[in-house]
A protein has these predicted regions:
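Basic, polyanion-binding surface patches
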Residues: 1-154
Length: 154
């Protein structure tokens, strides 16, 4: 299949916008906007995240480490844009969107899933991260930021 056909087809797969965040052993903070996040199992509660090998967060997502999947609300496009830009990783945390006291997470997100990495699988240009959800918190109403066809949905 030609690469271009696959890219066009995937543009029609609407999804919620998530930001993955973590802190490494040295205390460095990392985040990235993720387009490939999905639930894996309910028992145990687990998720799957795909991370490009060139992403700065890549090496911090290792077995046993903690991460947070922050599912964004409609009014959090700025956070999504910041975490998907080429800006230095440290600049992504120079605002009041975050609580960085433990596992960094976005305050006022639609949902936060606090996870521990259980397994990683290398697959061509990406790492598949399988993580067990240890706790979560969610807003009371549905107001999720959605993305499809190269842009945010209203």
């Amino acid at each position: 299949m030609p690469k271009e056909q696959f890219i066009i087809a995937m543009r029609f797969l609407a999804s919620s916008v998530s930001v993955i965040s973590t802190k490494d052993q040295s205390g460095n903070l990392y985040s990235m906007t993720a387009s490939s996040v999905t639930s894996l199992t309910i028992d145990p509660p687990s998720v799957l995240v795909c991370v490009n090998n060139s992403a700065s967060i890549h090496d911090a997502l290792t077995t046993g480490e903690n991460l947070c999947i922050n599912i964004l609300q409609k009014n959090q496009q700025e956070i999504s844009n910041l975490c998907s830009s080429k800006q230095l990783e440290s600049q992504r945390f120079e605002n009041d969107f975050w609580d960085t006291s433990h596992i960094p997470f976005i305050k006022n997100a639609q949902s936060n899933l606090f996870c521990k990495v259980e397994e990683t699988i290398a697959y061509h240009t990406h790492k598949i991260v399988i993580a067990r959800v240890e706790s979560s918190q969610s807003a009371k109403t549905f107001n999720t930021l959605m993305y499809a066809d190269g842009g945010y949905l209203n």
